[in-house]
Amino acid sequence: MPSRKKHLAGIIPLANLEDKLGFPYHPSLTPVYGGYLAVEAAVHEAAWAGCNTIWIVCNDDVQPLVRHRVGEYTYDPAFMDRSKWDRFPSQSRKTIPIYYTGLLSKDIGKRDCYAYSIIHGAQMAIDVSRAVSHWADPDKFYVSFPMGVYNPKALGYYRKEINKPGKAFGWRYEGKTVKDGEHLGFAFTHENLKDFRKRIMEGTGTYSRETLANGFQKKLPSEERNSGRHFSLDKVFQDVIFNEQEGFLRDISWYHKIDNWTGYRDYLASEHWYILRHPGKIYTKYREFNQIGVDDIDNSEE
């Protein structure tokens, strides 16, 4: 029986990202370098991690602008150095398709915390891939946060660990990970996804478990209903294990959380903005897949 190729699905959560910066646009569109946005840096990070597909979770209000900026696919940077020596480099590049999905209306206002955007993105990657073929089912998922800034090239050294089936992977900075609420990338498995869903379902609904004398359930006060929509990253992802038996945990040399003005200002004042400089138009140029039967006219070699 032929072996199935591994499928690492990249998840970039934009929906329900709290806006602490106060800019007149979505926080994911914040520049991290001249002409280089946070969401583009997140896509490039997912590409360095070795993702085969990238799923951007964003609602209809911001999706058109993000899609216009990011496009429908990017290239795997690990293959770029190899392809430049080929006679036709564009034919040797590895393409990574980018998909866009919004939250379901039944989840909005009930469990739509920022962490749930990650869960929803992973579930959509499973549902859509399985609809195509069971051979396309994702093995693992890698989360790339747009508001967590660090050197994406570091991921290239740990591709095998990130893609290893059945084991989680996480980045750590000064002893903290996503389990502490930091926007540090991590990879998780199907079993981890089940645990995340259970944690979200621990949130309250509209009614309490208390039954009244007339047999009806008691309604909770409005401030206590649907508590899952307020769950933080550390609460939802506290059960993921990063140890040598069940996962990997690796340290990074620098990291900035730019979801607030203080963190964003510190990042701009550091020398790290230059390390995270624009990777080149070859990765960020807007591209669309051609329709069936239409020749590929994108022959750019920039």
Give residue ranges: language-model regions.
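Catalytic-core segments of class I nucleotidyltransferases/pyrophosphorylases
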Residues: 134, 150-163, 175-301
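Residues in the short beta-alpha loop(s) of Rossmann-like NAD(P)-binding domains
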Residues: 35, 58-62
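Cofactor-binding loop segments of dinucleotide-utilizing enzymes, especially the Rossmann-like FAD-
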Residues: 13-15, 59, 146
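Short, charged/polar "capping" segments at the starts of alpha-helices
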Residues: 20, 62-68
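Short internal beta-strands
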Residues: 54-59, 171
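N-terminal nucleotide-binding beta1-loop-alpha1 segment
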Residues: 1-30, 36, 41, 45-54, ...
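Short, aromatic/basic amphipathic alpha-helical patches
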Residues: 66-78
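Conserved beta-loop-beta/alpha segment of the NTase-like Rossmann-fold superfamily
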Residues: 76, 85-202
